[in-house]
Amino acid sequence: GDLPVYLHEAEQRFCSDPMLNLSGLMGMQVTCREPDHWLKGGEELVLGAHAFRVVHAPGHSPGCVLFIHDASSQALVGDTLFAGSIGRIDFPTSDPEKMRHTLEKVMMALPDELAIHPGHGPATTIGDERRSNPFIRGGF
């Protein structure tokens, strides 16, 4: 069967609007079905024996979320934070001020030893990014 789809409620219109989901800007008209579950942030998502804390992390897009697996000190962070960089904030639905808040108040409140797995690129840790990421150290 189909896998269940989860999406943050701030991106509710992205499913049906190619300009909001940015496919329209790339010459495509991609739409998708509504998700099976809407996220708000603050939930616990259980997959098999693994529990993930869902944290709302807007900036790159209004509905970015982190999936934090506290038991293993790892997190899936999408395009919020990369090794040495951050997610783009020049898209029409991005918000630089919300990204700044997410990085300063959400990401940097996480423990240094937390391994983060971005949407693409190598894994890193919060501590490594706190020490060396120019967007964390110097802002943007």
Model-derived features with residue positions:
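Active-site HxH/HxHxD metal-binding segment of metal-dependent hydrolases
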Residues: G1-V46, H50, R131-G138
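A structural signal for short coil/turn segments at secondary-structure junctions
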Residues: G1, L110-P111
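Active-site neighborhood of phospho(di)ester-bond hydrolases with catalytic His/Asp-centered motifs
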Residues: V5-H8, V54-G59, L76-G78, A115-H120
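Divalent metal-binding pocket/active-site signature
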Residues: R13, I68, H120
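Charged phosphate-binding loop/patch that engages nucleotide di/tri-phosphates or the phosphate backbone
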Residues: D112-I116, G127-D128, I136
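Catalytic core of the metallo-beta-lactamase
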Residues: V30-A109, T125, R137-G138
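Short, active-site-adjacent cap segments at secondary-structure transitions
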Residues: R13-F14, A123-G127
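Phosphate-coordinating loops and pocket residues in cytosolic domains that bind phosphorylated ligands
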Residues: D17, H101, D128
